[in-house]
């Protein structure tokens, strides 16, 4: 059996995993696989168990199921997983279905028994750490969840916030341009309301700070993804981040860097929604704008406090799958390459590697097990090889993760980017020509390589030689991305030559 070079490389990297840590600096070098616990893997290992996303019911995914499929995740080169919230949820089947996703909590001191036991969650953490991998857990501090109208909430069901005194007075957000409304009024609607905790009160702050520190300690958690960050006043977050004692990345669902970037002053990182929108628009069709993406890369790295601590993504459980816009596999490969080789921490959403195409919630919350977990699909292999070269570059260049990605050129269909210290840089060339794109040679200047230097294109494992003028002749075809790395630096890596 022929074994792909990237699997050999990743295996070698895994067994040499460093000691675990959980600081922002340590998270820079991670690569995250995000999954909905209920939708990734079942304890019984079934790949046929029914999961109709339209029903919005529990489908049976568990923490033990994740443990059993860590080879599948690690085989793509991921070094961390992010799982959905673990707290006990509202028990009813609402008109919007079950709280299978984890964002309608009622008891923060109990676990969601649908996913397993406390021992199962601890076992997941241990299983990851034995592999040198990190555990990131999703948390919600903004709200609880209630099956019913906001005007008739029975606050006694919430633990420990069991009276109305802990909450903002009921009002739904009507105007998202009004930050006071965004923070003080409620999400949800009169079918499922999301009672909004008054996080300005010391009793609420202190409860959350104590809770989050205990959660991290009890389950040996390495990082937190924080939901609905913009709906809580900013001065709440530094204390929460400090109490957690690990890297925290917040969801600020807004594409304006002037709005989103300042939240990085109150927590370690945020999801890179400013990049998400131009990234999606650049590659969801063959007529997308490279200008907007080029400009936003530069804006984010100049305006955000630290673009190397942001989370880069194009899919999640709140936004439509990339393949719901286009089934062009070449475009999907380009967008995945960008995610992994841009600044910050790459985040791939479970099912993206199988080209899942669900649209808006709930269609984008498909069961990964229904794919059968193939490891030979085109995107699985591409993601694995991109993670492999990123992981290798990090191991060889201490400055790789803090070097800010530099888009060195653009035209209507192409954007090359450079990341890494001189002599060890990765140059990624992205195209939105699509799978029917023509074959041509791109003469690339500004890559920073030296005349006569040999480079390996690590997707196709071919080589090119830098011209006497310093330009790199890059063969382009079929709209596929290209990733260049100095050939001499690959010695002993198993990458392309294993």
Curated annotation (Swiss-Prot):
Gene Ontology MF terms: alpha-amylase activity; calcium ion binding
Sites where the protein binds Ca(2+) 2: 227, 251
Cofactor note text: Binds 2 calcium ions per subunit. Calcium is inhibitory at high concentrations.
Catalytic-site annotation from UniProt: 227, 251
Binding site for Ca(2+) 1: 142, 183, 196, 231
Positions of disulphide bridges: 51-59, 171-185, 261-304, 461-496
Residues reported to bind substrate: 56, 104, 143, 225, 230-231, 255, 318, 365
Pfam family, one: Alpha-amylase
Reactions that this protein is recorded to catalyse: Endohydrolysis of (1->4)-alpha-D-glucosidic linkages in polysaccharides containing three or more (1->4)-alpha-linked D-glucose units
Site (Transition state stabilizer): residue numbering on this chain: 318
GO biological process terms on file: carbohydrate catabolic process
Gene3D superfamilies noted in UniProt: Glycosidases, Golgi alpha-mannosidase II
Cofactor: Ca(2+)
Glycosylation sites recorded in the entry for this protein: 218
EC id: 3.2.1.1
Leader peptide range in chain numbering: 1-21
Catalytic class of the enzyme: hydrolase
UniProtKB keywords: Calcium, Carbohydrate metabolism, Disulfide bond, Glycoprotein, Glycosidase, Hydrolase, Metal-binding, Signal
Family of the protein in this entry: Belongs to the glycosyl hydrolase 13 family.
Protein name stated in the entry: Alpha-amylase A
């Amino acid at each position: 059996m022929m074994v792909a070079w990237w699997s050999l490389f990743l295996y070698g990297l895994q067994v040499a995993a460093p000691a675990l840590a959980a600081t922002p600096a340590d998270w820079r070098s991670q690569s995250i696989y995000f999954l909905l616990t209920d939708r990734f893997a079942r304890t019984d290992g079934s790949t046929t168990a029914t999961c109709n996303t339209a029903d919005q019911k529990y489908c049976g995914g568990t923490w033990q199921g994740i443990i059993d499929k860590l080879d599948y995740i690690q085989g793509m080169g991921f070094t961390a997983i992010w799982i959905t919230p673990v707290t006990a949820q509202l028990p009813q089947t609402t008109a919007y279905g079950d709280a299978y996703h984890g964002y309608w909590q009622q008891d923060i001191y109990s676990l969601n028994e649908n996913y397993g036991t406390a021992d199962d969650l601890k076992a997941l953490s241990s299983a990851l750490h034995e592999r040198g991998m990190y555990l990131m857990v999703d948390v919600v501090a903004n709200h609880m969840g209630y099956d019913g109208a906001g005007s008739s909430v029975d606050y006694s069901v919430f633990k420990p916030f069991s009276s109305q005194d802990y909450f903002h007075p009921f009002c739904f957000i009507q105007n998202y341009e009004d930050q006071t409304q965004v923070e003080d009024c409620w999400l949800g609607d009169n079918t499922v309301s999301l009672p909004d905790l008054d996080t300005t009160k010391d009793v609420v702050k202190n409860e959350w700070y104590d809770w989050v520190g205990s959660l991290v300690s009890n389950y040996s958690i390495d990082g937190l993804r924080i939901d609905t960050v913009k709906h809580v006043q900013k001065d709440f977050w530094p204390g929460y981040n400090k109490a957690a004692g690990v890297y925290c990345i917040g969801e600020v669902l807004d594409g304006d860097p002037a709005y989103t970037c300042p939240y990085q002053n109150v927590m370690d990182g945020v999801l890179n929604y400013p990049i998400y929108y131009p990234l999606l628009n650049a590659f969801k069709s063959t007529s997308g704008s490279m200008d907007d993406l080029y400009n936003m890369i530069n804006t984010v790295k100049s305006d955000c406090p630290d673009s190397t601590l942001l989370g880069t993504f194009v899919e999640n459980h709140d936004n439509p799958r990339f393949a719901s816009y286009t089934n062009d596999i070449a475009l999907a490969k380009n967008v995945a390459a960008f995610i992994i080789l841009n600044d910050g921490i790459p985040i791939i959403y479970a099912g993206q590697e199988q080209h899942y195409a669900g649209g808006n919630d709930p269609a984008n919350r498909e069961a990964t097990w229904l794919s059968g977990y193939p490891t030979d699909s085109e995107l699985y292999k591409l993601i694995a090889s991109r993670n492999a070269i990123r992981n290798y570059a990090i191991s060889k260049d201490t400055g790789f993760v803090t070097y800010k990605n530099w888009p060195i050129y653009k035209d209507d269909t192409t954007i090359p980017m450079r990341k890494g210290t001189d002599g060890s840089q990765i140059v990624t060339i992205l195209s939105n020509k699509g799978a029917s794109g023509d074959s041509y040679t791109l003469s690339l200047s500004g890559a920073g390589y030296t005349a006569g230097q040999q480079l390996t294109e690590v997707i196709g494992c071919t080589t090119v030689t830098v011209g006497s003028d310093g330009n790199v002749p890059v063969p382009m075809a079929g709209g596929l991305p290209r990733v260049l790395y100095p050939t001499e630096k690959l010695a002993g890596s198993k990458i392309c030559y294993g």
